[in-house]
Amino acid sequence: MRIDTSALCDIYSDQVDVVEPIFSSFGGASSFYGKITTVKCFESNGLIASVLEEEGQGRVLLIDGGGAVRRALIDAELAQLALDNGWEGIIVYGAVRQLDVLETLDIGIHALAPIPVGADDNEIGEVDTPVNFGGVTFFPEDYVYADLTGIILSPELLDLAELEE
């Protein structure tokens, strides 16, 4: 289903938080939504790879990379792993790389910027902890909705049937 964050903001203005417009879309899917799983790490993506090995149906991986853009936390291999395991999308408060491949994959990917340098593969960081960036606090189990216009957050699953009316 196509997500329209503008319409969702109009319908659920009292229920959603809007993430500051600091992200760009790099994946092949223009919109996505799901229940958040958070990873907090810095310039290392080993923990990200471990989480992406899990079943991702109905889930979005939200990565707090501290806003660092010196090393890419998501590359083509990790994006393909996410797609293979059914993840709906990935949001990276950090950088990504291999854009020519990312844009061909049917998964939503939002990040701050691209850079060709890869991350370390250490499994250092935290999983399912609250993270704060873009003017909002993301809690594990919250729901995130993203499209080319922006990213919004809700503590509850929104009724997307409202978009069709």
From Swiss-Prot:
GO terms for biological process: regulation of RNA metabolic process. GO terms for cellular component: cytoplasm. This is Regulator of ribonuclease activity A. Signal peptide: none annotated. One of its GO terms (molecular function) is enzyme binding. Its main location: cytoplasm. It is found in: Cytoplasm. Homotrimer. Binds to both RNA-binding sites in the C-terminal region of Rne and to RhlB. It comes from the Bacteria. Keywords: Cytoplasm. It comes from Actinobacillus pleuropneumoniae serotype 5b (strain L20).
